[in-house]
């Protein structure tokens, strides 16, 4: 599935399956097919609802200054970004893993802790992040630029001091570079592990090169244009990283927060384990996560199964 921009999001009516059932219920095979179709549409509706503007409160919806449609896109068909960002499972796993990495930076954590509704509206925060990615990846250039401008305005207001009195600002180019490098690396790692294990090194570097536009537009410096450059940014920041009580609390909120519904509970739990497994060893140790080598094949096989099932449901 590609997570389409807000103006294109639509859930196919599940009621349509009922009409199909009445026309096709004629034997065990047609019954099984009808049940499968109902299940498929139900799963699709649940997943798409998470990204649907109608499913969020008026206060937390992503607002776009313009709805003017244009064929011009930041990333045209064939872009690697469109491929990598087009899978729900890998984006969820990569997004959570990236978030766990980002929170190890005291200034990033402080910005989220002091200025965000993260602790009280985790689902809303994740939804808004997902929609920003959807708009910038698949929306028109006008929609993408409007979303970027909105985020920049928000960043300008996020300022404060750390416990030791050191000032921080969300618009700090080095912090933006850290967030971008960890996010893109995590998205790509999840894609390679669960969708395209034979992805070429050239395509992986092309992903970073394409995403460099977003980093630069948001104000990041340095702007990473290859996997190696992203790795260098992450390695250079490691001496400043800390996992304190607040980082652990945010980690618990992310990993063990309530699922949107009971159906999603087992899938969410598996996804959280996959996100922890995706972390580099040093980050896993900082968080105090165990390294379940015996469980790792089960986690990866289960996540791969979920990914394939969701692709089937959303194709």
Can you describe what each PLM-predicted range is?
Residues 2-178, 182-315:
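Mature, function-bearing regions of proteins
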């Amino acid at each position: 599935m590609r997570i389409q921009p807000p103006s294109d999001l639509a859930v196919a009516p599940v009621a349509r399956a009922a009409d199909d059932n009445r026309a096709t219920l004629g034997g065990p095979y047609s019954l099984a097919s009808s049940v499968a179709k109902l299940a498929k549409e139900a799963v699709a509706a649940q997943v798409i609802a998470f990204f649907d503007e109608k499913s969020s409160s008026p206060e937390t919806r992503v607002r776009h200054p313009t709805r003017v449609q244009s064929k011009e896109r930041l990333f045209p068909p064939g872009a690697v970004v469109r491929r990598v960002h087009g899978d729900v499972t890998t984006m969820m796993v990569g997004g959570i893993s990236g978030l766990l990495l980002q929170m190890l930076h005291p200034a990033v954590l402080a910005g989220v802790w002091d200025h965000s509704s993260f602790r009280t509206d985790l689902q809303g925060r994740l939804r808004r992040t997902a929609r920003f990615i959807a708009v910038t990846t698949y929306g028109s250039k006008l929609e993408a630029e409007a979303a970027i401008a909105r985020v920049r305005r928000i960043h300008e207001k996020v300022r404060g001091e750390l416990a030791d009195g050191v000032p921080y600002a969300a618009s700090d180019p080095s912090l933006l570079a850290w967030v971008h490098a960890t996010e893109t690396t995590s998205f790509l790692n999840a894609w390679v592990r669960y969708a395209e294990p034979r992805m070429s090194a050239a395509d992986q570097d092309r992903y970073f090169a394409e995403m460099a536009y977003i980093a630069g537009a948001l104000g990041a410096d340095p702007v990473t244009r290859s996997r190696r450059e992203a790795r260098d940014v992450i390695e250079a920041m490691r001496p400043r990283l800390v996992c304190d009580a607040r980082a652990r609390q945010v980690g618990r909120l992310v990993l063990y927060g309530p699922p949107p519904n009971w159906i999603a509970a087992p899938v969410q739990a598996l996804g959280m384990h996959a996100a922890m497994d995706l972390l580099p060893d040093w980050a896993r140790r900082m968080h105090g996560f165990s390294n379940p080598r015996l469980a790792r094949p089960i986690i990866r096989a289960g996540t791969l199964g979920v990914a394939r099932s969701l692709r089937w449901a959303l194709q």
